[in-house]
């Protein structure tokens, strides 16, 4: 069984999307506590804050996405954005690197850490 690689930008976008749904779910739970206004308001506010947090994450990843390096994936020939020393193609999940020292090595997220020495 092979390891499933995923693009960092897509991971962060998926996290932001999940925050939206979690926030809506939490706010919806507040409806079941209509008798107790404090509990209902608390659930609705926490859900609202989760949706606002997702907006902040979407804005942050949008700003980060404008600063990334765009490359053409050698496997699918589509343009993709790369964050860090190693990343995966957004379309075909092919492991990618721009670092000549890492070419031919097994794909590992640890290569992006500052503490890693090649």
UniProtKB/Swiss-Prot annotation:
Chief subcellular location: membrane
Q: How would you describe this protein's topology in the membrane?
A: Multi-pass membrane protein
Q: Which InterPro entries match?
A: UPF0295
For whether the record's keyword set contains Repressor, the answer is: no
Q: Which stretches are transmembrane?
A: 12-32, 43-63
**Alphabetical UniProt keywords:** Cell membrane, Membrane, Transmembrane, Transmembrane helix
UniProt subcellular location: Cell membrane
What's the superkingdom here?
Answer: Bacteria
Query: Gene Ontology cellular component?
Result: plasma membrane
What NCBIfam families does its record include?
PRK02935.1
Q: Which family does it belong to?
A: Belongs to the UPF0295 family.
**Classification via HAMAP family:** UPF0295
State the protein's name. Answer: UPF0295 protein BCG9842_B4782
Identify the species of origin.
Bacillus cereus (strain G9842)
């Amino acid at each position: 069984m092979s390891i499933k690689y995923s693009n960092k930008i897509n991971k962060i976008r998926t996290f932001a999307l999940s925050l939206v749904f979690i926030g809506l779910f939490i706010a919806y739970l507040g409806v079941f506590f209509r008798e107790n206004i404090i509990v209902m308001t608390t659930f609705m506010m926490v859900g609202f804050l989760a949706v606002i947090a997702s907006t902040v994450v979407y804005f942050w990843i949008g700003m980060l996405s404008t600063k990334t390096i765009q490359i053409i994936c050698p496997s699918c020939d589509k343009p993709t954005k790369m964050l860090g020393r190693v990343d995966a193609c957004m379309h075909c999940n092919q492991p990618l690197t721009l670092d000549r020292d890492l070419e031919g090595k097994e794909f590992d997220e640890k290569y992006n850490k500052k503490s890693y020495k090649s």
